[in-house]
From Swiss-Prot:
The keyword Chaperone does not apply. GO terms for biological process: glycine decarboxylation via glycine cleavage system. This is Probable glycine cleavage system H protein. Its cofactor is (R)-lipoate. Coiled coil: none annotated. Disulfide bonds: none annotated. Binds 1 lipoyl cofactor covalently. GO terms for cellular component: cytoplasm; glycine cleavage complex. The glycine cleavage system is composed of four proteins: P, T, L and H.
Length: 127
């Protein structure tokens, strides 16, 4: 099965994605991750203002099959949280790269994204 891997994103081996624009990064889980999880029934995210550390967990995604931690691709301060996921966790399944975004972060050090997987490297990992 082939999964969508947008070329404008960077990826973690743990199946999170990050879209960096200036000093802001939007974060979510990949199409592969949501498929592996199955139907998502609950999402726990941090509050705005929370400090994230790259590689550390920041939330939980619960599906009918599993409970999984979600990891920060970059360090920084949470500036927005997708509150729709509290009432509509299925957005992670329906649109993981769009309406299913999880949070935005004011990035402390953009060079951290240099260590993340390129789209091609992530494709190689999930094939």
């Amino acid at each position: 099965m082939s999964f969508d891997v947008p070329d404008d994103l960077r990826y973690l081996e743990s199946h999170e994605w990050v879209r960096v624009a200036g000093d802001t990064a939007e974060v979510g889980i990949t199409a592969f991750a949501q498929d592996e999880l199955g139907d998502v029934v609950f999402v726990e995210l941090p509050d705005e203002g929370t400090e994230l550390t790259a590689g550390e967990d920041f939330g939980v995604v619960e599906s009918i099959k599993a409970v999984s931690d979600v990891y920060a691709p970059v360090s920084g301060t949470v500036t927005a949280v997708n509150d729709r996921l509290r009432d509509e966790p299925e957005l992670l399944n329906e649109d993981p790269f769009g309406d299913g975004w999880m949070l935005t972060v004011e990035v402390d050090d953009k060079s951290e994204t240099d260590d993340l997987l390129s789209p091609d490297a992530y494709r190689d990992q999930i094939e």
